[in-house]
Curated annotation (Swiss-Prot):
Cofactor stoichiometry and binding remark: Binds 2 [4Fe-4S] clusters. One cluster is coordinated with 3 cysteines and an exchangeable S-adenosyl-L-methionine.
Encoding gene (name): miaB
A GO CC term assigned to this protein in UniProt: cytoplasm
Catalytic activity, EC: 2.8.4.3
UniProt enzyme class: transferase
Keyword field contains Transmembrane: no
Protein's name in the database: tRNA-2-methylthio-N(6)-dimethylallyladenosine synthase
Organism encoding this protein: Prochlorococcus marinus (strain MIT 9301)
Length: 464
């Protein structure tokens, strides 16, 4: 950990008074979960949530570095806050997350107004780090460390659906990905600690949990113990069986899965366990074996298709979503077309797409066969058009179906509708009946007859 005494021109008043805070989160679900935990820590310290970042006494950016445009957004936000700090010296400015881990002390040189730079492994240490800031220091916390148990009381954004981290970090070495260098090695939480957190959520009337990990089906590889069959004693499959009996929790989801570890045993567990939802997010990244090899993904298209076939053999209506990268270095037109072909063949419910973006300290970033921005833009547009077309077609299967929808709130764009999600994770809007006395609470499950399908959402009416 680096601790520096601030120079006079950027020194914050030496004052431990709290005030208000604002957190802006960039990136993935893991970052969202981390932000909830940091918000909980700040409120435990006495901070209150500001109505906007311009009124906050502490501004925290929880950052992403998976693509360059995410980084540039952060620097744009920081520039505005740096100017504000010269007018409001007591402002505390914090950068957390993957960009903080990647850049470390160099962030202080680029933005000397910063008070604290902290990587993802230090989320649970926020209070101690801010204590050092209150003593008049600039602090950089990016050293690799054992992640302290997740005992913070998160300030959950939802009162119904809760994130639960079960494994931190990533041991994979995909040639394009910066995550292992910024999130560190895999660290699995112990099953009893995970179950205790889920029980706390159930006690607080949460109805749905999503288990989180960079490669969630790698859970338990670093934990001790093996079975007499020679497999690891604590796997994601074992964890699902272990937590399934927590009373009050109705739905269990997990993300993100790696095809390399997605086993038949896991699929069988998802089929047998009533609370586990029929929604699987399994990135394929490319539809071409040679590109997958260059990406160091560790599986073939044949293996990926077998996973999907095994899921659909037991759960034919399961929702399958994925991630894909186009314009990877050296990707030919034919290799790119293989990706489009896979999307059409599988029939994904949704695919998160991105054009390849070179990231620091990754092998692919220095390859000489980078594709042009024009090719990236064209391929990204074409794949997005196909994804939307496929998703629209897939959603047609819901028309006239009666689906169970977990109510999450009112539609913010239409107060005459409530919204929630199906077990297959389809966002669903439901017209509030006017001709009957219909009382509902957040977390209720209602039966909805679907009468309209768009690419990424459904609309329906209450089925009595």
């Amino acid at each position: 950990m680096l601790t520096k005494t601030k120079s006079d021109e950027i020194k914050t008043q030496k004052d431990s008074t709290t005030g208000s805070y604002w957190i802006t989160t960039f990136g993935c679900q893991m970052n969202k979960a981390d932000s909830e935990r940091m918000a909980g820590t700040l409120e435990k310290m006495g901070y209150t949530r500001a109505d906007n970042e311009l009124n906050a006494d502490l501004v925290l950016y929880n950052t992403c570095t998976i693509r360059d445009n995410a980084e540039q957004k952060v620097y744009s936000f920081l520039g505005r806050q740096a100017k504000r700090k010269h007018k409001t010296p007591r402002l505390k400015l914090v950068v957390a997350g993957c960009l903080a881990q990647q850049e470390g002390e160099s962030l202080l040189r680029r933005v000397p107004e910063l008070d604290l730079v902290m990587g993802p492994q230090h989320v649970n240490n926020l209070e101690n780090l801010l204590g050092k800031v209150d003593l008049g220091n600039q602090v950089v916390a990016t050293e690799e460390t054992f992640i302290s148990e997740d005992i913070t009381s998160a300030r959950r954004e939802s009162s119904i659906c809760g994130w639960v981290n079960i494994i931190y970090g990533c041991n994979e070495r995909c040639s394009y990905c910066v995550v292992p260098s910024v999130r560190g090695k895999e660290q699995s939480r112990y099953p009893n600690a995970i179950k205790s957190e889920i029980q706390k959520l159930a006690d607080d009337n949460f109805k749905e949990i999503t288990l989180l990990g960079q490669n969630i089906d790698a859970y338990g590889r670093d934990l001790p113990g093996t079975t007499k069959e020679g497999r690891k004693e604590n796997t994601l499959t074992d964890l699902l069986y272990y937590i399934h009996d927590v009373k009050g929790i109705r739905r269990i989801r997990f993300a993100t899965s790696h095809p390399r570890y997605f086993s038949k045993r896991l699929i069988q567990a998802c089929y047998e366990l009533d609370k586990v939802c029929e929604h699987f997010h399994i990135p394929f990244q490319s539809g071409n074996d040679e590109i997958l090899k260059q990406m160091s993904r560790g599986y073939s298209i044949k293996k990926y298709k077998n996973i999907i076939e095994n899921i659909r053999s037991l759960m034919p209506d399961a929702s399958i979503t994925a991630d894909a990268i186009v314009a990877f270095p050296g990707e030919t037109e034919k290799q790119y077309q293989d990706t489009l072909k896979l999307i059409s063949e599988i029939g994904f419910d949704q695919v998160n797409t991105a054009a390849y973006s070179a990231r620091p300290n990754t092998p692919a970033a220095v390859w000489t066969n980078q594709l042009s921005e024009e090719v990236k833009k064209a391929r990204l547009q074409e794949i997005n058009d196909l994804v939307e077309k496929t998703a629209r077609s897939r959603n047609q299967r819901y028309i006239d179906n009666i689906e169970s929808v977990l109510i999450e709130g009112l539609n913010p764009k239409n107060s005459s509708q409530i919204m929630g999600r199906t077990r297959t994770n389809r966002l669903t809007f439901v017209e509030i009946p006017k001709n009957i006395n219909f009382n509902f609470s957040l977390g209720d499950e209602i039966n909805v007859r679907i009468n309209e399908a768009r690419p990424f959402s459904l609309t329906g009416e209450l089925s009595l």
